[in-house]
Curated annotation (Swiss-Prot):
Protein name: Zinc finger protein 6
Entry keyword annotation includes Membrane: no
Gene ablation phenotype (knockout): Reduced number of trichomes on sepals, cauline leaves, lateral branches and main inflorescence stems.
InterPro entries registered for this protein in UniProt: GIS3/ZFP5/ZFP6, Znf_C2H2_sf, Znf_C2H2_type
Zinc finger (C2H2-type): 41-63
Length: 197
């Protein structure tokens, strides 16, 4: 049998060599030392040989981490990042594994409606999407403003239903005549410090 010209390895063990050794007589081969000295462990990913199994195990752990990073990069690439983002996962998949998840970059969902309740003086705001507008005096739907669209973008979404509410007029951009504060384009803050009213 010609074992020197062909070899078949599985997990670093030459299979053809072991079968030919079993077929040969029990005569020792010349120049062979103990079995542990001549045994080499081969990486199944890059075919690099190692002297012991511990070194091979550590090396294969590095391959495992590389595969995890590539798998994460592929998952991110299949989900698709927004087009306005300056990051291209196809150019370097290892770097794309450290990118923020796409759902953090997508357009935010609108927050629930905030209802102004006329019945309770201690807690004026109620949160809920299923409250009907006939039970509330006014409602405020903040949409994109709470997520970085700017407070001025909320001013156009304020609607009042029946009655004159100074709290709602402040959000809509009207001036509060009692305090003299002019709120322009939606929400404004009086940042002047004073000791009294």
């Amino acid at each position: 049998m010609a074992t020197e010209t062909s070899s078949l390895k599985l997990f670093g063990i030459n299979l053809l060599e072991t079968t030919s050794v079993q077929n040969q007589s029990s005569e020792p081969r010349p120049g062979s030392g103990s079995g542990s000295e001549s045994r080499k462990y081969e990486c199944q990913y890059c075919c690099r040989e190692f002297a012991n199994s511990q070194a091979l195990g550590g090396h294969q752990n590095a391959h495992k981490k590389e595969r995890q990073l590539l798998k994460r990069a592929q998952m991110l690439a299949t989900r698709g990042l927004p087009r306005h983002h300056n990051f291209h996962p196809h150019t370097n998949p290892l770097l794309s594994a450290f990118a923020p998840l796409p759902h953090l970059l997508s357009q935010p969902h609108p927050p629930p409606h905030m209802m102004l309740s006329p019945s309770s003086s201690s807690s004026k705001w109620l949160y809920g999407e299923h409250m009907s507008s006939q039970n509330a005096v006014g409602y405020f739907h903040g949409g994109r403003g709470l997520y970085g669209g700017g407070m001025e973008s909320m001013a156009g979404e304020v609607k009042t239903h029946g009655g004159s509410l100074p709290e709602m007029r402040r959000f809509a951009g009207d001036s509060d005549r009692s305090s003299g504060i002019k709120l322009e384009n939606g929400i404004g803050l009086d940042l002047h410090l004073s000791l009294g009213p």
